[in-house]
Amino acid sequence: HHEHGLRIANLASFDAGAYTLDGVTRRTGALDRMMGVRRTGRREGLKSSYARIEDAADPLLEGIGDTDLIPNEGALVEIAPDAQRVVPLTLIPPVIAHSGATISIPEYSAIKETTDIPVAVRGTHGKGRVVYFCNQPELLFYRYGFPDLGRVLANAVRWALAEPAVIDVDAPDFVEATLMTQPGRRMVHLVNFPVSKPLNTGWRHMGRTLVPLADITVSLALGSGERVREARAATTEQPLAVQQD
């Protein structure tokens, strides 16, 4: 949830707002009206299922590339979206290679069924924007680190905020960037954090071979009337090249 000015950006997923503080299921989810959805059911055990891309030009799918599918698993809340809601992703039920198969490789497993069951919806509420994921993309991204899941989440945040990014870093995707703001100063912390193998624990091991990086470009949005006086590396005090628009 983010509020700026009179606009509100709200992202939610799965069971957000579905329970009271005492853990009792609500008859109507606390966020359902804002999200523009009505809960109609639930699906469990969606291993080897997918989200089908309905519109590759949708802002939630920017940068996804040449694919029609995004991996999915776990549970999903079935909803009936309001007519004003856009549905960029729909559910493809579990793809099974054959009866009793424990693994299904999409290249060798025919997709026999598609649905119009939403996986994600977006729209407006008041003067703000809202996005609701019926599944748990943040958990799946945490568990598997699949890049497309991260891109969809990041795109949802950008679209909902409807404002320019305050920082943009042109670097390999394993570089972590953190921005801290203080009066008259911006501090950008970059961490070269390669991973030597994929993990499903959510914890990333440091790469065994650390390769130095160079020529990373950091772009920052300045406030009204602000100008950059100097930029330097905090560890060495070495001046850095600056270009101001």
Predicted regions and their residues:
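Accessory, solvent-exposed terminal regions and/or long lumenal/extracellular loops of proteins
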Residues: 194-197, 201, 207-210, 221-227
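A glycine-centered loop/beta-turn motif at secondary-structure junctions
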Residues: 5, 9, 29-32, 59, ...
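Solvent-exposed beta-hairpin/edge-strand motifs
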Residues: 84-89, 157, 212-237
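Short intrinsically disordered coil segments
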Residues: 148-149, 204-206, 233-236
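A glycine-rich, often tryptophan-bearing local segment used as a flexible ligand/cofactor-contacting loop or short
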Residues: 1-67, 73, 154, 158
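Solvent-exposed loop and beta-edge segments used for protein-protein assembly and interaction
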Residues: 182, 210-212
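Residues that form or immediately flank small-molecule/cofactor binding pockets and catalytic motifs
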Residues: 12, 92, 236
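Solvent-exposed beta-strand/loop surfaces of large extracellular or lumenal domains
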Residues: 102-104, 108, 228-244
